[in-house]
Curated annotation (Swiss-Prot):
Protein name: 1-deoxy-D-xylulose 5-phosphate reductoisomerase
Gene it is expressed from: dxr
Keyword Hydrolase: no
EC code: 1.1.1.267
Binding site for NADPH: 11-14, 123, 125, 202
Record organism: Phocaeicola vulgatus (strain ATCC 8482 / DSM 1447 / JCM 5826 / CCUG 4940 / NBRC 14291 / NCTC 11154) (Bacteroides vulgatus)
């Protein structure tokens, strides 16, 4: 029986690579639903190739265009946030790949968990914003949440039953500005920030990687995926991106997962878990690896990592505040409305201006997200 897969964000970097995995294993996987935010042309192309049961476009203004383009196919067409959240509940679906960008992925992921679907989680913001809620729901509905982030997939693959962890070690490439001085960071452009040295990703996550907010979010994500305390989660800069992450056990032994910097590998493992499936992806050639280096991250130059740790220690709705402010400032940076270093200033100020809630409900997260965005936008315009 083929696994039926719904891909939330099929036109993005993770979504398109997931379709490559499915295409390589047509005997194992079948696309049930594809969703996108705005990119109608690519969604149509994907629908014609993979023939899903349904497609959803989040932007309701694009519905008629999508409907017309697929009028000759027996594919159901839906639009809007409600449709996006409802499609994941469809009975045939086995796995939901949550690869939408940002806060928008929270509600459909919650609905998928409640519907008992296995979650292949690429949308780290879902756990950043509401990790405690997601974990509680996953336990309540007995729903597996499998990491797709390369670092968390690496940790997941290194874990051993009944062997207690001392800490997890997340590796970071350091991004394009790893060796830049503070003076150089003051004048970097979005064009420079969008050139990641090792990974091909979408614009938002590429900027997050350059600012190290992406690594900060992964620290928060690791807390909820693996039940770690903040002080048990270490970040080490590893420019070669060959070691994807490590775990250290109480006896001092360390296990690492190595591989090419190719997101199709963790995507495929999330789809096939607990089995491993043969792939044609490029193999690691140790004879060509000249060095593997490590260094401590500089949180003075890359303050976002320190802000993420602070949010994790404070807990409650603080990570939600950081995520919302970050989405606002990254959008502003991509529109040349704020400097690279200025992003951290706005995030930190937003953390101090939005009301703190120690034990937030889902409604509190919704309100916090809206208020943090309002505050961050007002700081940008002041």
């Amino acid at each position: 029986m083929k696994k039926q897969i719904a891909i939330l964000g099929s036109t993005g970097s993770i979504g398109t690579q997931a379709l490559q995995v499915i295409e390589e294993h047509p005997d194992l996987y079948e696309v049930y639903a594809l969703t996108a935010n705005n990119r109608v042309d690519l969604l149509v192309e994907q629908a014609r190739k993979f023939m899903p049961e349904a497609v959803v476009i989040a932007n309701e203004e694009k519905y008629l265009q999508l409907k017309e383009a697929l009028s000759d196919l027996p594919v159901k067409v839906y639009a809007g946030a409600d449709a996006l959240s409802q499609i994941v509940e469809s009975q045939p679906i086995d796995i939901v790949l949550a690869s939408m960008v940002g806060y928008a992925g929270l509600r459909p992921t919650i609905n998928a968990i409640k519907a008992g679907k296995a979650i292949a989680l690429a949308n780290k913001e879902t756990l950043v914003v509401a990790g405690e809620l997601i974990n509680a729901l996953a336990n309540q509905y007995h729903t597996p949440v499998l990491p797709v982030d390369s670092e968390h997939s690496a940790i997941f693959q290194c874990l051993e039953i009944n062997n207690r962890l001392e800490k997890v070690i997340l590796t970071a490439s350091g991004g394009p500005f790893r060796t830049y001085t503070m003076e150089q960071l003051q004048t970097v452009t979005k064009a420079q920030a969008l050139k990641h040295p090792n990974w091909e990703m979408g614009a938002k996550i590429t900027i997050d990687s350059a600012s190290m907010m992406n690594k900060g979010f992964e620290v928060i994500e690791a807390k909820w995926l693996f039940g770690m305390r903040p002080e048990q989660i270490e970040v080490v800069v590893h420019p070669q991106s060959v070691i994807h992450s490590m775990v250290q056990f109480e006896d001092g032994a360390v296990k690492a997962q190595l591989g090419m910097p190719d997101m199709r590998l963790p995507i495929q493992y999330a789809f096939s878990y607990p089995e491993r499936v043969k792939s044609s992806f490029e193999r690691l050639d140790f004879a060509r690896i000249t060095d593997l280096t490590f260094e401590q991250p500089d949180t003075k130059r890359f303050r976002n990592l320190a802000l993420a740790y602070e949010a994790l220690y404070r807990a409650g709705n603080m990570p939600c505040i950081v995520n919302a402010a970050n989405e606002v400032v990254v959008d502003a940076f991509l529109k040349d409305k704020i400097s690279f270093l200025g992003m951290s200033d706005v995030i930190e100020q937003t953390m101090g201006k939005v009301a703190y809630i120690k034990e937030p409900t889902y409604e509190d997260y919704v309100d916090t997200d809206a208020e943090a965005r309002r505050v961050a936008l007002s700081l940008l315009s002041s």
